[in-house]
Amino acid sequence: MKTFVFIVLVALAFVLTAAKEERANPSELVSALAELVMLDAERGVDKPGCRYLFGGCKSDDDCCPRLGCKGKGHDYCAWDGTFSD
């Protein structure tokens, strides 16, 4: 119980600190979020028509990035074991 209360207090302190920093300079937050969206677009995370985790597939090309077609008989998209940079 003591550990749970400690974790809640640390999380609350983190949220309050982050909110205070956001109010101090919201343009930095907006630019950071825009950069993340651009990086996802460059990596092809939002590739149209790709199959997500556990989606049906016929080949690795059917799956979204970082996923590969696995299984025998009932093929599905699963993590291919790679990490992003």
Curated annotation (Swiss-Prot):
Expression by tissue: Expressed by the venom gland.
Keyword line: Disulfide bond, Ion channel impairing toxin, Knottin, Neurotoxin, Potassium channel impairing toxin, Secreted, Signal, Toxin, Voltage-gated potassium channel impairing toxin, Voltage-gated sodium channel impairing toxin
Domain of life: Eukaryota
Any single Gene Ontology cellular-component annotation: extracellular region
The keyword Nucleotide-binding is assigned to this record: no
Domain notes: The presence of a 'disulfide through disulfide knot' structurally defines this protein as a knottin.
Protein name, per record: Delta/kappa-theraphotoxin-Pm1a
